[in-house]
């Protein structure tokens, strides 16, 4: 046989190299004595994932136990992560690499707001002291009525860059309980003043408050819409949850406003960033990956945001639930198998499935509501979640729920 006859072509060489890498991965597992030993060696797991052999060594449903500390609560936990999917990911630099997708088996020990109720007014220039009113544009719930106007009197000016907040829970709270809070900027927690609201049209009209559409920034007094003012914003890329999950900062330091109408989440001062609870050994094997999430079709155009998140909430699509739009990620085999279905699970109580129940890491017999990142596309303020009863539902971004976050070893 001649020299040239013994040379592998490129395809044969690639096959051989893949085979050698797979054999080496298997040998390392054998050498590690036990799978339990391997699943605590994060760097070795990462080497296997990078070699493209994770699905040969691991099974969907295998668990990796990771120490996590609730820094603010001074409480240590072991957080089991289920292997839910094998699939390529895109990194910030645009490269595509193999990934092993993990999701927390239990949910977090406390709640976080997806989004606080947003400000209804942003001061492009100083708003002088005086009486002002706004007019609602749609009947909503028992208390918000189309054409009704509500007035309030500022005793102090609102500086340029400041906000007016208020009308929180307007469809469900009696108008007699409504308040307006003036703030110096979109980061402040304590108001300049708290003002009573009464029905009336005295003073200067700030404008007609739209129901669910985009803010018209060309107006002299641009008003947020009723939905986001009452119950928050359902856009994952702007959410408090996205910031909390991806921060190692201390309590009070993990959130920044994403737009002029954003408001600090209620948990900002009381909880440290989620990533602060992990050791560097685990954080070194996960990194930000591209996450696609559809925007709503009322205040936005329904297109997709692309964020790069180390930790993220699952989408409807990823937990094998019925979707409103495809493109928020491949379904995870873990959920298809757990649900025992060959088609995606439907929504609401009539489609409950006990496999969806997620229990608290600090109360492992107590099922909890857990957040998803998918927006309910027909509203500006509703996001999807998995109800504690085991069914997929949607509700206001304002409410604080727990989560079972995901990440990718890559």
What positions do the PLM features span?
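Collagenous Gly-X-Y triple-helix signature in extracellular proteins
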Residues: 25-410
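Short, low-complexity N-terminal tether/leader segments at secretion or assembly junctions of large
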Residues: 1-25
């Amino acid at each position: 046989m001649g020299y040239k006859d013994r040379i592998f072509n490129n395809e044969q060489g690639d096959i051989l190299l893949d085979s050698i890498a797979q054999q080496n991965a298997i040998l390392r597992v054998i050498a590690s004595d036990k799978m339990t030993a391997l699943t605590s060696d994060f760097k070795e797991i990462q080497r296997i994932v990078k070699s493209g052999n994770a699905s040969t060594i691991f099974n969907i449903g295998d668990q990796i136990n990771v120490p996590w500390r609730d820094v603010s609560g001074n409480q240590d936990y072991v957080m089991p992560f289920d292997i839910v999917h094998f699939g390529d990911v895109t990194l910030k630099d645009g490269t595509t690499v193999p990934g092993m997708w993990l999701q927390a088996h239990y949910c977090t020990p406390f709640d976080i707001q997806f989004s606080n109720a947003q400000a209804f007014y942003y001061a492009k220039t100083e708003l002088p002291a005086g009486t002002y009113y706004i007019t609602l544009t749609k009947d909503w719930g028992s208390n918000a009525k189309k054409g009704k106007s509500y007035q309030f009197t500022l005793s102090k000016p609102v500086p340029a860059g400041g906000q007016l907040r208020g009308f929180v829970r307007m469809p469900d709270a009696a108008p007699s309980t409504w308040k307006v809070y003036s703030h110096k900027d979109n980061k402040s927690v304590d108001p300049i003043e708290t003002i009573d609201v009464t029905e009336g049209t005295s003073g200067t009209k700030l404008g007609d408050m739209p129901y669910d559409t985009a803010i018209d920034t060309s107006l002299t007094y641009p008003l947020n819409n009723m939905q986001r003012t009452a119950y928050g914003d359902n856009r994952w890329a702007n959410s408090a949850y996205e910031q909390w999950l991806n921060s190692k900062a201390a309590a009070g330091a993990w959130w920044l406003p994403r737009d002029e109408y954003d408001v600090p989440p209620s948990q900002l001062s009381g909880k440290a960033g989620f990533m602060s609870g992990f050791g560097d050994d685990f954080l070194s094997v996960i990194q930000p990956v591209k996450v696609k999430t559809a925007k709503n079709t009322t205040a936005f155009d329904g297109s997709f945001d692309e964020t790069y998140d180390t930790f993220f909430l699952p989408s409807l699509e990823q937990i094998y639930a019925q979707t409103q739009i495809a493109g928020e990620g491949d379904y995870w085999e873990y959920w298809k198998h757990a649900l025992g279905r060959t088609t995606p699970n439907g929504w609401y109580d009539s489609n409950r499935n006990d496999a969806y129940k997620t229990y608290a890491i600090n109360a492992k017999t107590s099922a909890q509501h857990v957040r998803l990142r998918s927006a309910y596309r027909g509203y500006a303020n509703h996001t999807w979640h998995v109800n504690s009863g085991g069914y997929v539902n949607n509700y206001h971004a304002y409410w604080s729920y727990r989560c079972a976050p995901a990440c990718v070893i890559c």
